[in-house]
Amino acid sequence: LDAAIADAAVPPIARATALELLAPYLSAHDVPAVEQALRDPDPQVRRAALALLDAWEPPRRWQTGAPLLADPVRSVRLAAVDALADAAGTVTLPESQRATFATAVAEYRAAQMLNADRAESWLNLGALDARLGHADAAEAAYRRAIDTDPHFLPAYVNLADLYRQLGRDGDGERVLRQGLTVSQEATLQYALGLLLIREQRREEALTALGAAANAAPEVPRYAYVYALALDNAGRRADAIAVLEAAQRRATGDREILTALVSLASQSGDTAAAQRWGAALQQLQTSAAEPR
């Protein structure tokens, strides 16, 4: 993928797609390709590269991405705000950069308000304010998103996560249960399950996490977390069964394989531990090969 990203002969849309495909496998090996993509002449490539900066530490993210706050293309500037909002507070900014950032943030807000009748715009504003550390404004924006479209489920999840960060899981549970009256969708069940684990309400958590894993079997993370919760509840055989089923659907998932190795080892099943360990080693070897 790195070679395709760096090859100017490859069409821009293909290079942007290569950057999107790189996201789950991003490593230090890929840094030069991402940095080069941030300077690419085509704006869709620059936008795709900005989306990868979340994996970097905030100070480095700011240092690398800040020039794009003044990009000549508006959509790139907006993507830069999204990528850098929570990084700005981690570095001491000279006056010129503070002004550039403030201008870009104002432009981002104005762009969202053009579609203020859509819940997605309020979600975006809430996420921006949350990353800027403006908790009250973020809460109000997420509430506005829910009021605008009660069936827009990401707003419930984001608001509950904001409450988690604020130490208000009681409010978060109420929000998620409100969302579940609209839809039993997996993301709501998963978020509720994690909240209930934090609250030490394990049986309720297992019910919610199991519902998420069953509703969205294509998402390995749900099965992984559900299996860990089962194991912590003393149900190792059930946990292994959940992981094995998930592994059959997602053969290249590192977390699933790692958990299978761990649980097989703890169970004294040497043959299974070796089998899953070999699969994990093969996956790691493939990931280390140049893309």
Label the model's feature ranges.
Residues 121, 155, 188-189, 222, ...:
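TPR alpha-solenoid repeat register
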Residues 55, 86, 131, 165-166, ...:
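Register position in tetratricopeptide repeats
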Residues 1-5, 27-39, 57-69, 91-107, ...:
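Amphipathic alpha-helical scaffolding segments comprising HEAT/armadillo-like alpha-solenoid repeats
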Residues 25, 40-41, 56, 71-72, ...:
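Structural marker of alpha-solenoid helical repeat scaffolds
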Residues 73, 118, 152, 185-186, ...:
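Residue-level recognition of tetratricopeptide repeat
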Residues 108-109, 142, 176, 209, ...:
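Hydrophobic/aromatic packing residues within the alpha-helices of TPR/SEL1-like helical repeat arrays
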